[in-house]
């Protein structure tokens, strides 16, 4: 299995041999969907809350008399039928959204994503990405020269200059291999992997 090795202008300078176990797997759509949903669910804080009719602040006074008004009878304004009343089935903060995925499935799913990105031409390898200063403009110009508008960079080591330069770019994400996640891999149009990160990805997902 070979991937394109890009130069600083985003052009294919050569080809690089990469492990089939990570970049040459068959795509399993059901498995990828499962790990993406699990990742998003596990990222939820689970702090949303609404009030039922017993929790909203209200008066216990009857809004209007029982008979003679032509309206449907009403006991108090906390009823879910009234604006400002409680919810019938409120969301509670003790809900558990956790989805469990075992390590073998997660590794297989991540490898399937990397393999599909390689087949679609959305995955490329660069020697390294080093900056002399933490200037966002320098990194933005670098990606512009490579014709990259939406890019995720997986670098073997993210130094302070690279981190500071990338954090203010909306469509750029720079992470180390251990922080690569399925949602970001699927979302970005291009994924750049530094040469030094290939071995780390193989250790994690092979």
Swiss-Prot record:
Assembly information from the UniProt record: Part of the 50S ribosomal subunit.
The organism's taxonomic lineage, starting at the top: Bacteria, Pseudomonadati, Pseudomonadota, Betaproteobacteria, Burkholderiales
Any one Gene Ontology molecular-function term assigned to this protein's record: rRNA binding
Stated name of the protein: Large ribosomal subunit protein uL4
Role this protein plays: One of the primary rRNA binding proteins, this protein initially binds near the 5'-end of the 23S rRNA. It is important during the early stages of 50S assembly. It makes multiple contacts with different domains of the 23S rRNA in the assembled 50S subunit and ribosome. Forms part of the polypeptide exit tunnel.
Gene name, Swiss-Prot/TrEMBL: rplD
Disordered: annotated span: 44-77
Ranges of biased composition (kind: Basic residues): 56-65
Keywords, alphabetical: Ribonucleoprotein, Ribosomal protein, RNA-binding, rRNA-binding
Bilayer-crossing regions: none
Domain of life, per lineage: Bacteria
GO annotation, biological process: translation
């Amino acid at each position: 299995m070979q991937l394109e090795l890009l130069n600083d202008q985003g052009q294919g300078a050569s080809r690089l041999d990469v492990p089939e176990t990570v970049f040459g797997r068959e795509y399993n759509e059901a498995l990828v969907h499962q790990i993406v949903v699990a990742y998003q669910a596990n990222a939820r804080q689970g702090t949303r809350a609404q009030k039922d009719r017993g929790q909203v602040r209200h008066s216990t006074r009857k809004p209007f008399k029982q008979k003679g008004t032509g309206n449907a009878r009403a006991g108090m304004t906390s009823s879910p039928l009234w604006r400002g009343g409680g919810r019938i089935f409120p969301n509670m903060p003790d809900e558990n959204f956790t989805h469990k995925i075992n390590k073998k499935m997660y590794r297989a799913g991540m490898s399937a994503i990397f393999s599909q990105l390689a087949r679609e031409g959305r995955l490329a390898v660069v020697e390294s990405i080093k900056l002399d200063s933490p200037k966002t403009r320098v990194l933005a110009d670098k990606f512009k020269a490579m014709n990259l508008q939406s890019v995720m960079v997986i670098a073997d080591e993210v130094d302070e200059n690279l981190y500071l330069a990338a954090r203010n770019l909306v469509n750029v994400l720079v992470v180390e291999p251990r922080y690569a996640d399925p949602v970001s891999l699927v979302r970005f149009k291009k994924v750049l992997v530094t040469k030094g990160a290939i071995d780390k990805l193989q250790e994690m997902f092979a």
